[in-house]
Amino acid sequence: MNYQKAVLDKKATSIKLRTLRIEARLTHEMLAELLQLNSSRVIYDWECAKKMPNVENLYNLSLIFNMKMEDLLVIR
């Protein structure tokens, strides 16, 4: 079997999420509201690579940004 473990590049993923949000002309608050989050703080945390979105939020982000879920992530 030819298997190589995928590793999530959290910093590059956080930059990608920030870029997508800005290109969509969404504020942290607007994106948090679309995702029905209690606070926009979590968006800041994602964009600083302190935390990563869970699967449900990744799915909803993919709908908001009109892309495949796996394309939101930067894998090395």
Where are these regions (language model features)?
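DNA major-groove recognition helix of helix-turn-helix/homeodomain DNA-binding modules
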Residues: 56-71
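Short alpha-helical DNA-recognition segment
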Residues: 25-45
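A short, Lys/Arg-rich alpha-helix, primarily the initiator
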Residues: 1-23
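The alpha-helix within a helix-turn-helix
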Residues: 21, 32-33, 62
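Residues within the helices of the helix-turn-helix
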Residues: 18, 29, 59
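Phosphate-coordinating loops and pocket residues in cytosolic domains that bind phosphorylated ligands
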Residues: 45, 74-75
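Short alpha-helical elements of helix-turn-helix
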Residues: 15, 40, 55-58
